[in-house]
Each structure stands twice: as structure tokens, then as C-alpha cells.
Amino acid sequence: MAYSNILVGAGTRPAQPVVRRIGIADLQEALAKGIDDFYAMPTHAMFLCVIYPIVGLFLARLAFGYSILPLLYPLASGFALVGPVAALGLYELSRRREAGLPTSAVRAFDVLGSSSIGAITALALLLLTIFVIWVALANAIYIATFGYATPTSIENFANEVLTTRAGWTLILVGNLVGLLFAVLVLSISVVSFPLLLDRDVGAAVALLTSIRAVARNPFTMMLWGLIVAALLVVGSLPLFLGLTIIVPILGHATWHLYRRVVEPQAAPPPTHDEGHRERRYAADFPAVLFPWAR
């Protein structure tokens, strides 16, 4: 039963969320609201995302040992694949601010008590698996083009990649494969995590809703993916420190994008309609004698 709830939510027949058609104006609105949330909660957002520059600097330091230098780019770009998981606290803060609830930093961790935490964990593990597969494939592509030789220096590695046929093959094939992984993750996560924070629909419904959102808005969603990728590159340039601003804005904006693309949940119907209930006087006795008390 627990596994069933993770997949389909607490209800036996979860309502399928309604997906809207959106345009460029909706992306602009989502980004504007994301920036507004960041200005309203900058300390909280930067506290949640300080891990990004720390990890980036750690990877850069390891790269100077040259052993993982060929994987530095796949690792750095691959963090975008698990970014939706890291942004869960940002979604929660935006959700709470939208609802007029307290938005202190500790409230970001309310996601751990969400009724959908099982489904969220399942999708997080899926993204982590995709990330691991991406890094393994990136390593295989490097070995296929350059062999098992370890770069002797950063300058030597850059020269080999940028000035040789094998290097350009690595760049072309690696980025094409990376693009496929990025499209896959965008399709299954663009609204799935915000949806699970908003409603207990289960991992399967959330994942399929995200895919439907991309299928109905292919151009707009691909443009959103390009915006995310471009901003992450810009944020990574100054030793990854720009990510302390870029990631919070994108996280908040993703929540508002979800609000634009998925219709709000309708009010739940009443459990029964007293006006249409078949009268059973014997069963209702003696309450039937006092109709004003019902």
C-alpha cells in the first residue's frame, strides 16, 4: 500500500491536473516573480544554495590534481540534472509566500514533512540515477576519443580538446548526449516537484503531468530550458559564486512557472449531497422528527 501511495498518491483515483498552453509572456512573468521572491527572501535563498559554490570550488580544486579534469565539465553541467531536487526548499518558500504563510529559513525544510515526501524521494532518486548515468557516459565518450591517458596539465588538456579532431569530436558528441539528458530531465521535472509540494498526486501522476506540460508547450518549454542553461553558465563563470543568485531566482521562478502551466486545483466536492439522499425514515428515526437539528 505504501508503494502504491508513492506512485499514485493517497487517493485511489487521483485527479489528473489540467495543463494550460503558455507563451513567452508567461516565462517573463515567472522570472519576474522569481526575482521578486529572491529580493523578498535573499538570505533564505542564499542560505539554501550556498552548497552550489562550495561544490563548484571543491570540484575546481580537485581538477588541479588532473585525475578528474576530463570530468569537470560533465560534473558541473550535470548538477543541472539534479537541480530540481536542490531547489525543493525554494519552491516551498515561494509556495508559502504566495499563500501568505511565514517564510523563515527553517520553513524551507517543511518539505521533509510533506505528505508527498515518498513520491518526492522517488523522483529525486530517479534524477540522481540519470546524473550518474550521464557522468558514466561522459567518461566513456572521453575514453573513446582520447583513451585512458591522464592530462598532464590544464593547458595540455585545453589544447588537446580545442585544437584536435578528437577534441572537437568530444565536444560535439558530449554536448549532443548532454542535450538529450537535459531534455529528458526537463520533461520529467519541470513541474513535477512543485506539483508534489502542492498536491499529493503521487510520483507517476506528477511525472506524466510534467511530460504533458512539455508536450503541449514544446517551444516555450525548450526556451525555458535554454534560459536555465544560459543563466547557469553565466552564474558558473565567476568561480561558481554567481550561482548563489542564479539558482535561487530560477528555483523561485520554477514555482511560478508551475502556477502558470498547471491549473489550480478545484475545490473538492462534498462527500455527500444531503438534498439528493434517498430518505429512509425508519433508519433516520427519531432524527426525522427533528429536521431542524440535522
Where do the PLM segments sit?
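Hydrophobic alpha-helical membrane segments
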Residues: M1-R294
